[in-house]
């Protein structure tokens, strides 16, 4: 099971998006991840996270259902398709596409980890990966420091 290393407790380290308003502080897609869980064949992935709006942390769990193309689909602030694209024991990088109720599309990158900020080298890789996804460097947010929600 390739996905065994995905399971467990994680924190969001960095988020990038081509629509910055969605992920800036208090943005609806600034997700502070806490836990990932897969069922046996990982056809379902459960993601538990907080969103912080008006200094209120609200905890949410969504279940992503694996699609034929390998992405997971779930509903949160619209329609989402996400997938892990890179995983090590320390970090997982997800790409995600959100289409909100107004039909606006946002492409995102989430980096989750074990409470450690990105090294300069990891940050550099993230900048390159963001560019490949047409996301400018200034839209990369290191969100670990702003995560004040319960562990």
UniProtKB/Swiss-Prot annotation:
Q: Which Gene3D superfamilies match?
A: 2.40.128.20
Enumerate the SUPFAM superfamilies for this protein: Lipocalins
One cellular-component annotation, GO = extracellular space
Chief localisation class: secreted
Q: State the UniProt keywords alphabetically.
A: Allergen, Disulfide bond, Secreted
User: Does Disulfide bond appear among the keywords?
Assistant: yes
Location within or outside the cell: Secreted
Name one molecular function that GO assigns to this entry: odorant binding
What is known about the tissue distribution of this protein?
Expressed in salivary glands, hair and urine.
Disulfide bond residue pairs: 38-42, 57-149
One Pfam match: Lipocalin
What's this protein's function? May act as a pheromone.
Family statement drawn from the similarity comment of this UniProt entry: Belongs to the calycin superfamily. Lipocalin family.
From the Swiss-Prot or TrEMBL record, give the protein name. Odorant-binding protein
Species source reads Phodopus sungorus
Q: What is the lineage of its organism?
A: Eukaryota, Metazoa, Chordata, Craniata, Vertebrata
């Amino acid at each position: 099971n390739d996905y065994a290393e995905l399971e467990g407790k994680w924190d969001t380290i960095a988020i990038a998006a081509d629509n910055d308003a969605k992920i800036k502080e208090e943005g609806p897609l600034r997700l502070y991840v806490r836990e990932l869980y897969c069922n046996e064949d990982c056809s379902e992935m459960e993601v538990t996270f907080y969103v912080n709006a008006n200094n209120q942390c609200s905890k949410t769990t969504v279940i992503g259902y694996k699609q034929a193309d390998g992405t997971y689909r779930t509903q949160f602030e619209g329609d989402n398709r996400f997938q892990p694209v890179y995983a090590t024991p320390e970090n997982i990088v997800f790409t995600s596409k959100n289409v909100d109720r107004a039909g606006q599309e946002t492409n995102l990158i989430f980096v989750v980890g074990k409470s450690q900020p990105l090294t300069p080298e990891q940050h550099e890789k993230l900048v390159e990966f963001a560019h490949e996804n047409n996301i400018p460097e200034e839209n990369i947010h290191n969100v670990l420091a702003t995560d004040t929600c319960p562990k």
